Amino acid sequence: MKKTVLSGVQATGSLHLGNYLGSIRNWVKMQEEYNCFFFLADLHSITVDIAPSELKRSVIETLAIYLAAGLDPNKVTIFAQSMVKEHAELAWLLNCVTPLGWLKRMTQFKDKAGKDQEKACLGLFSYPVLMAADILIYKADIVPVGEDQKQHLELTRDIAGVINRKFNKEILKVPEVLIGGSGTRIMSLRDGSKKMSKSDSSDFSRINLRDDNDLIHQKIKKAKTDHLSFVSYDKEARPEISNLLDIYTTLSEEKLENIIQNYEGFAKFKEDLAEIIITNLQPMRDKYLELMNDQEYLLKILHQGAEKARVRASETVNELKEQFGFVI
């Protein structure tokens, strides 16, 4: 029997090269080998202020990107998180066994809430519990994540352990965390110490998957390097050029040493890197535009995926509710 893989991307903003190399491209490979559930995390999206029209648009656009990148709805289950109400139901059950102290240690809440944490919503604080519900509800064997989500996955494992000990049986599967290799952590084009992010105020900090060719050339040309005039790889001393080299090697699948030897300076290196990015993204962008012209098809995929996901999700929730003593 195939192992189950679960992952998702928050449905806000425009997906970028970091999302593609860190998550989506790997999902496309995994769909051949695993029983995959890939979702649009729209419940997570409302933990910050977002206009209703933007949320709806983001869900549809993200789905179109998933499909354009190569995810096959006949091979994987793709759905919007909010369409499977059991996610929220399980999150509440898990909230009731998760110690407050565990959530206070979550570093992402501190980062996202900023200095005035008193004004942050409860949903943002309990975000990791909903994330745990997203994973545990499908009894996932493997959860591929970036390094920045490792703390949340450890919390998920801890929560599963609490439930299993409470009822003295393995109700929830403790998942294996899969931290990706090359290309999983693409950094900002403006600051090599920060991860590429759709929430960054500067659009030139990232390559959006829908950027046209001219804009990609502009962004790579203006990407920060340093005062040195040669190409070399050193994550600590030269984070910006090292990040560009990571992108180059991941997309071209060439050896790092060969790439470094081919370039004396930044100009030709950046020009070639932009072309490599365009070669990889243009077919996806063309397919995306085609899919966006068929909204009826996209909605059909979401509803079919949700219906399929709900079968698995309801089994887990009902099993746990029975253990708690609810009448079902």
Curated annotation (Swiss-Prot):
Protein family according to the UniProt entry: Belongs to the class-I aminoacyl-tRNA synthetase family.
Transcription found in the keyword field: no
Protein name: Tryptophan--tRNA ligase
Catalytic activity: tRNA(Trp) + L-tryptophan + ATP = L-tryptophyl-tRNA(Trp) + AMP + diphosphate + H(+)
Any one of the GO BP annotations: tryptophanyl-tRNA aminoacylation
Pfam families: tRNA-synt_1b (PF00579)
Enzyme type, top EC level: ligase
Subcellular location: Cytoplasm
Alphabetized GO MF terms: ATP binding; tryptophan-tRNA ligase activity
Principal location listed in the UniProt entry: cytoplasm
GO annotations of cellular component type: cytoplasm
Motif extent ('KMSKS' region): 195-199
Presence of keyword Cell inner membrane: no
Subunit structure, interactors included: Homodimer.
Annotated EC: 6.1.1.2
Domain of life: Bacteria
Function in brief: Catalyzes the attachment of tryptophan to tRNA(Trp).
